[in-house]
Amino acid sequence: MVKRLGLALAAPLAAFLASRLQRRANIPEHLLHHVAFQEDALIDVDSGRLLNQVLREMAADEMGLPTNVAADLKTAVRPLHRHVGEARPVEADGSCSHHLLVRDGNSSECILPQRIDVAKHYIMTGGPEAIREPFEDMVSRVSSFGRYMFNLTEMPVVEQLFAGPKFQRAAKSVCPNSKQVLDPFQYNFILSVPGQTVALHLDAPWFLGATRFQFPQWLLAVMVFSNLFQERFVDQVQVVGYLHDRPALDDDSGGRFLYYDQNSATPKAVLSKPLSGVAVDGSKTLHAAGVFRPSVKAPLLDKDKDNALFYVGDEKWQLRSNGEVLQIYNSSDLRMTIVYRARCFASEEDLGPKQWCTVVM
């Protein structure tokens, strides 16, 4: 009798334990259930050609495309408040001894990177793909290359992207119904080499009175997660568009756009087809990219060195570290994206006070 009772209870007990032990995301409710909009051919062929030309011209200059850590220091903005007290002097050799600190541009201080929140989460969890490897390898995996630009008038082809009907339709499907006036403000080029990924993250949030022009981005992300400043939160929409001309990246190539709209162990995934795009409010929807060509080991990049990707012509690219060429790639080896963003406002009148947050401090 006891044996039969034990057998009868075994199956439901096993099912209960399995449900309790199943891996799941732990995302606050206010960061779930937001809209993501995907469209093939979101970028027209002519715009794609011009954007690829602009990208190569940028990557051919003396700066090239720095890693994302360096790009925040070199090509984005310098916040009024660079740190919250963690700054330490650089070592005699110019390095930062603490593994989580980086040099603050050309200054004599080491500070937390702008997105230490993203890096630390990835190192501790391995991201959606639960990667486990040495610290230096993980840092190299998420050190993609790019530039951040805020002056849209310098790039007519980007202005045309924002004005086009496809962006307008996608953006207005993401912005709240009560905030359908769009305010374009930023675009980025982001390139990944084989073995790299884009770690799970929120995009730099904007609040009335608190933006990346005033405070470190990791602090702004903390404000979003806390849900204590919602009355000052500025909704936005970003489009991740794909500029590589290779066929859609399949399961073997990886590099898909990943996002969480529910607390599930598995994120939703979208193929990175050429000239397609995904529109989402990345400042309140956690998103990432799968590892691009996961069978390839990403090049080891020392955080204390000047690492950048350069276009050298004839569809060839050089990865350099302190001027030394570490690797040569073909354009077909790279995952290429443009990310362009607009804020969502309720009326044209709301656009007036925005100027305070677009002035570099």
Feature-to-residue mapping (PLM):
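Signature of the catalytic double-stranded beta-helix
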Residues: 118-232
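Active-site region of the double-stranded beta-helix
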Residues: 225-235, 239, 243-245
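Catalytic core of Fe(II)/2-oxoglutarate
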Residues: 246-361
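Extracellular structured ligand-interaction cores
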Residues: 40-42, 184-186, 195-197, 234-240, ...
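Short, solvent-exposed loop/turn segments at secondary-structure junctions
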Residues: 42, 48-50, 70, 189, ...
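Charged, glycine/proline-rich intrinsically disordered loops and linkers
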Residues: 90-140, 201, 207-225, 296-325
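N-terminal auxiliary "cap/dimerization" subdomain that precedes the catalytic jelly-roll/cupin core
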Residues: 2-167, 332-337, 343-361
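A short catalytic or substrate-binding loop motif that flags glycine-/basic-rich loops and adjacent residues
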Residues: 180-181, 231-235, 249, 330-332
